[in-house]
Design a protein with these regions (language model features):
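Conserved RNase H-like, two-metal-ion catalytic cores of nucleic-acid enzymes
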Residues: 1-92
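Hydrophobic faces of stable alpha-helices that mediate helix-helix packing
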Residues: 56, 130-137, 189, 193
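Short, surface-exposed acidic
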Residues: 69-71, 100-108, 201-209, 239
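Short linear loop/turn motifs
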Residues: 77, 105-114, 210-216, 243
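A polyampholytic, Gly/Pro-enriched intrinsically disordered region
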Residues: 90-103, 229
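Acidic, Mg2+-coordinating catalytic module of metal-dependent nucleases/exonucleases
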Residues: 103-163
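Acidic catalytic cores of enzymes that act on phosphate-bearing nucleotides/polynucleotides
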Residues: 144-253
Length: 253
């Protein structure tokens, strides 16, 4: 099983956009936009084992969006960690373990999965992420047995329950530039960040489209005047004025 999701690339926030399923014989795609929450919950919280690859972000997304905790999930990435492959991306692992080279089309790496209908070739691209999961699991387990690493695997799988409540800091706050700020500058940054988030949600656009992260830093460092903010094209004039007024009021405080 695998998901295609929207992560603040084409619209605001994170959204589950497509579910890809392969049962070993047949392929299925589920449109979460057309399925009730109760049906999604019944499917994802069932006792049927679900093979994923590196499922952490997917688990958090369906929990934050639907309150669903994926049950009976087996993450193949745990097997990769046990044998310590140098490259851990799915395609690299498939090439290493199955000698199958997958050429991914770059145009789908930023595909807008919120659009309907989804193009047929995009669906085929999405299904390629589940095509080899059964074979990959078998090949990894075989190598683990051959290298006498079953005890290591048991220790790896005996880990704390997945923390659905843990929230990661926004990417922009992980930058060294932010970390070097004193408390006062961090406070100013956080206020401007929240203002941008609120308007991004209002117009349903990624925050970086409202105005770029670089400008956020420049405002904090006073290297850019509020009136000189360069807004993204999708931001309506009326919203631009409100943002400038709100930031100006904050600046005068």
């Amino acid at each position: 099983m695998d998901f295609e999701c929207e992560f603040n690339l084409h619209c605001y926030g994170e959204r589950l956009c497509l579910i890809q399923v392969f049962d070993g014989q047949e392929y299925y795609v589920i449109d979460p936009f057309s399925v009730s929450k109760s049906e999604l919950k019944k499917t994802l919280e069932s006792d049927v084992v679900k093979l994923f690859y590196s499922a952490g972000s997917d688990r958090k997304l369906v929990f934050s969006q639907y309150g669903i905790r994926i049950n009976a999930l087996f993450d193949i990435a745990d097997l990769v960690d046990v044998i310590d492959l140098r490259k851990k991306g799915l395609n690299s692992v498939i090439e290493e373990m199955l000698s199958i080279r997958i050429k991914k089309k770059k145009k789908y790496q930023k595909y807008n999965w919120t659009r309907r209908p989804i193009a047929e070739d995009a669906i085929q691209y999405a299904l390629s992420d589940v095509r080899y999961l059964f074979d990959l699991k078998d090949a990894l387990l075989k190598r683990i047995r051959e290298n006498d690493l079953m005890d290591t695997l048991a220790c790896r799988l005996d880990k704390p329950e997945f923390d659905y409540e843990k929230r990661n800091a926004p990417g922009v706050k992980k930058k060294s530039r932010y970390k070097k700020y004193n408390q006062q500058k961090k406070k100013i940054f956080d206020v401007i960040f929240r203002i941008r988030e609120r308007y991004a949600k209002e117009i349903d656009k990624p925050p970086n489209t409202v105005f770029a992260n670089e400008q956020l830093f420049q405002l904090v460092e006073k290297n850019r005047e509020i009136e000189d903010i360069c807004f993204g094209k999708p931001v309506p004039t009326e919203v631009r004025k409100r943002i400038i007024n709100e930031l100006s009021d904050m600046h005068r405080m």
